[in-house]
Amino acid sequence: MTVAYIAIGSNLASPLEQVNAALKALGDIPESHILTVSSFYRTPPLGPQDQPDYLNAAVALETSLAPEELLNHTQRIELQQGRVRKAERWGPRTLDLDIMLFGNEVINTERLTVPHYDMKNRGFMLWPLFEIAPELVFPDGEMLRQILHTRAFDKLNKW
């Protein structure tokens, strides 16, 4: 079994309901179970500011699935909850599920990049992750605690 860390975000169609439904769906993924869930945080949008704030959280999910199998499930959950993928980056969305980490693996395929390509620059991903895995060490040996200390990300407000 591998522990995958998944970032959850929503800023459309009742974000609290979206995230709670996503958590139920993540818990229903075969050969997987949720270990822990962070608090829910309210964060400003990345990119265009003419959209609602996001609800962000992190989940530790233990799974025996392969990384791309897990990705298939997370993308199916997004679609079931009304996610429409548009050319516009950082636009509003009903649900965003990003596989931030998959054990200690480094994955770089056409469909999946793990660790998440920009997570070390995103406080809205790192603070919830720190809440559930404060001693986490990235595959490159960098400690999550040290990243948060040296980059001085603003603390997040709870939802």
From Swiss-Prot:
The keyword Nucleotide-binding applies. It comes from the Bacteria. Thermostable. Retains 75% of its activity after heating 30 minutes at 96 degrees Celsius. PROSITE patterns: HPPK. Pathway: Cofactor biosynthesis; tetrahydrofolate biosynthesis; 2-amino-4-hydroxy-6-hydroxymethyl-7,8-dihydropteridine diphosphate from 7,8-dihydroneopterin triphosphate: step 4/4. Pfam families: HPPK. Belongs to the HPPK family. Monomer. This is 2-amino-4-hydroxy-6-hydroxymethyldihydropteridine pyrophosphokinase. The lineage of its organism: Bacteria, Pseudomonadati, Pseudomonadota, Gammaproteobacteria, Enterobacterales.
